[in-house]
Amino acid sequence: MRIIGIDPGLGRVGYGIIEIQNEKKIFLDCGVIETNKNKGEGDRLYEIFNDLNTLIDQWKPDIAAVEKFFFYRSSTTISVVQARGVIMMVFAFKSIKVSEYAPSQVKLTIAGSGKASKKEVIEAVMYNLNLTRAPKPDDSADALAIALTKLNEEGFN
């Protein structure tokens, strides 16, 4: 089974790809889809659409896990929600089942506390995937944590 975890955003979409082989979690890839901040919102959303389609075609994940978004009073709220909509649409188009997780649920599952720090989450991701270096940028570490949350739910602790 192969999973892709997604940390949504308009400027950067973090992704992390993990595979289960012989009951073990194997790190495959992580990174970010970065959009051109000098382009309009529609063009940036299209970049996310294109690049996520390319990632899916390359890695062929069986399932996806995406961070749930909660509304905060922020100027970026609408942009993130729009980006997340594009992400969900791509998975629907590719017939990939999506599970959604709140940030506090990811932190609790991965680091043992719903209020875990960014550092604690990164350390837990490194431990769970036997990584010697922290995934960079942080958006990709978050995406791996989201994927690990789904795998934990599936019984791969």
Curated annotation (Swiss-Prot):
GO terms for molecular function: crossover junction DNA endonuclease activity; DNA binding; magnesium ion binding. It is an enzyme of class 3 (hydrolase). Binds 2 Mg(2+) ion per subunit. Its main location: cytoplasm. GO terms for biological process: DNA recombination; DNA repair. Belongs to the RuvC family. This is Crossover junction endodeoxyribonuclease RuvC. It comes from Prochlorococcus marinus subsp. pastoris (strain CCMP1986 / NIES-2087 / MED4). The gene is ruvC.
